[in-house]
């Protein structure tokens, strides 16, 4: 685009995730269609192979740019009855067990309970299971006056002061206890772990875990959609309203978090 008055030149893809791309938009659209048409998504290696991209780095960057566009800022919060719990996902370190999980990512999950079924979900990678981290997640993800059901971990205490109705169920050390007492959130946790292991072979790094969580949330919250075309349209729509992210910005989080490890407290 060219402004005759000031001689300024711009592009229709400026300010979008497509900005500065050297490959045709039709290839981007093929990537979006493939990603949204696959039930479990794809890995960067799979996308490189399907599109015939010459570089794994390009496929990796495209996937992360699209994941950034999958979750809208300011989206509606969960409401009603919501189960909240934490879990660890990702890699392990030899000789580390119990509550210190090395390079694993600490994830907090919130799930709307609709009768015997599940509504929408929210997920976040957090540094620790402190009240500050957990309260911030709840406030950002769940509407006040909702009923928040947790496992009784001390980090959830005080949510009543933020206008939440709180229920806590003390859960034993056995995983089967958690699954029985809080079935909805633990079903989502199980599906998340299966997806990370199956589609990405467990290779999602802690530095970039937020992007993978955004993709899982995008897919899960649209799981009942019968039209792949609507998913394609939605992702394209959000891609053109998402700010560009150069490759260096995408990898920066890896450098800045490589020496830090999550402080795991009270999650199973």
Where do the model's predicted regions map?
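Residue-level recognition of single "structural anchor" positions
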Residues: 1-268
